């Protein structure tokens, strides 16, 4: 319909992307969350009424080092880890000797972090003392692979092994954590 239209993608995090939109430096912004009331109000004040609609869904995955035997925890456990109520692996399993739990996200302003704060912590800030921000999702996988006490949080699309053309094999360097709503 508009053959002369060209898009120049800018790959950035949610915070920078929203700021670019608010500053009217971009006209199109893909994000993983609905606009806040404040964002919506600012956009309406500056120009055209924003159109917001879902185009797809993604999932998040929790990953641990291959040497960590605890690969199944509850959503409540995750909430307690992120809120600082659980800080050591042996609080989840007395036999686990991995020490302090290090939680690793891709970056301080990622959509994954926003989702965890909004959906798991109900909008409350993360209070875990051992939070690490890697540069990107690949860095999270690498960090978890090298750090036995880490638990990484990534988009589920990062789990696939590129050597598997059927996309049914998880990465060999890490173990995917199973989450349960109830006690394991």
Q: Where are the language model's segments positioned?
A:
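Exported/periplasmic ABC-transporter solute-binding proteins
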Residues: 1-26, 33-34, 41-44, 51-56, ...
């Amino acid at each position: 319909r508009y053959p002369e239209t060209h898009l120049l993608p800018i790959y950035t995090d949610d915070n920078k992307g929203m700021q670019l939109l608010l500053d009217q430096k971009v006209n199109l912004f893909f994000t993983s969350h609905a606009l806040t009331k404040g964002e919506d109000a600012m956009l309406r004040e500056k120009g055209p009424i924003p159109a917001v609609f879902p185009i797809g869904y993604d999932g998040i995955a929790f990953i641990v080092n291959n040497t960590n035997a605890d690969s199944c925890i509850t959503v409540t456990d995750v909430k307690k880890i992120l809120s600082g109520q659980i800080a050591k692996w042996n609080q989840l399993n007395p036999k686990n000797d991995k020490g302090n739990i290090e939680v690793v996200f891709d970056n301080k302003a990622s959509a994954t972090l926003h989702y965890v704060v909004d959906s798991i912590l109900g909008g409350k800030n993360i209070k875990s003392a051992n939070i690490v921000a890697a540069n990107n999702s690949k860095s999270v996988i690498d960090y978890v692979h090298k750090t036995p006490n880490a638990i990484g949080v990534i988009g589920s699309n990062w789990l696939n092994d590129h050597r598997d053309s059927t996309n049914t094999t998880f990465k060999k360097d890490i173990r995917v954590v199973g989450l349960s709503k109830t006690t394991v």
